[in-house]
């Protein structure tokens, strides 16, 4: 009711927003798990198609059995060059997936003829969808979270050096470019502010991401120690605010599941 009162056209047409009453629609569809899919395609291409390390049937059996008693095979599939560093086959697949998905969304209007805007945004549902998804060819186990937004999975860059820059470039590369957003999730340790040139490097990173075509940055600047303390006793840190995904919230106001999701992501990024 409130939405209808503040929109042009609903009163004049006597139609609800959902029934075609407004003049302009901004309808979006968001894709999930870009890195999970891109890394899976790259793993299949390298280990099965090019190297013949296993057959299609063997892979199907491993996925059905959730890599049971096959940790060496799971790690083999996981250890391919992943989405994020630049120039990998997984980078190729991520871009191809983004383009194919965007073209499909743009060419498929709603039943009422409205065009949709594609984006790659998980909205904090990586645990929810991951819990329903069986094992995947990139070495992910059944029930594990899917990848966040269009960000590379944690650990995508061997050694970890330069990860924020590489991640920024990767996310900018796969933007659907139709107005909907594909956020870059950055979780930085607060100690960066006390290092020489630390703040300037963050400023440069933000500017570079925008110049490459990035549309949104979700940024956390927090120490691991403070985060873990707040997770153990949220009420002892009532003023701690975190960027969950497309929104910020007091950490203590989040459910235990959401708090754990934020903790897991930040700890993985800083590992």
Map each language-model feature to its residues:
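Acidic, glycine-enriched catalytic cores built around paired aspartates
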Residues: 1-271
């Amino acid at each position: 009711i409130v939405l209808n009162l503040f929109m042009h056209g609903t009163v004049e047409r006597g139609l609800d927003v959902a029934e075609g009453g407004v003049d302009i629609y901004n309808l979006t569809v968001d894709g999930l798990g870009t890195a999970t899919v891109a890394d899976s395609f790259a793993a299949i291409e390298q280990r099965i198609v090019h190297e013949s390390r296993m057959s299609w049937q063997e892979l199907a059996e491993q996925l059905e059995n959730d890599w049971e008693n096959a940790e060496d095979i799971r790690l083999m599939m996981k250890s391919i060059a992943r989405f994020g560093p630049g120039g990998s086959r997984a980078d190729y697949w991520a871009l191809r997936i983004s383009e194919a998905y965007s073209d499909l969304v743009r060419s498929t209007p709603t039943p009422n003829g409205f065009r949709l805007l594609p984006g790659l945004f998980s909205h904090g549902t990586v645990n929810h969808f991951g819990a329903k998804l069986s094992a995947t060819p990139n070495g992910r186990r059944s029930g594990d979270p899917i990848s966040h937004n269009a960000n590379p999975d944690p650990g995508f860059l061997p050694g970890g050096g330069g990860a924020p820059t590489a991640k920024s470039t990767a996310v900018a590369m796969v933007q659907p470019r139709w107005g909907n957003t594909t956020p870059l999730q950055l979780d930085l340790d607060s100690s960066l502010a006390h290092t020489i040139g630390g703040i300037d490097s963050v400023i440069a990173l933000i500017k570079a991401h925008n110049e490459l075509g990035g549309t949104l940055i979700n940024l956390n600047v927090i120490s691991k120690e403070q985060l873990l303390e707040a997770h153990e006793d949220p009420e002892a840190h009532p003023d701690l605010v975190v960027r969950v995904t497309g929104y910020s919230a007091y950490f203590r106001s989040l459910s235990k599941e959401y708090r754990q999701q934020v903790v897991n992501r930040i700890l993985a990024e800083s590992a």
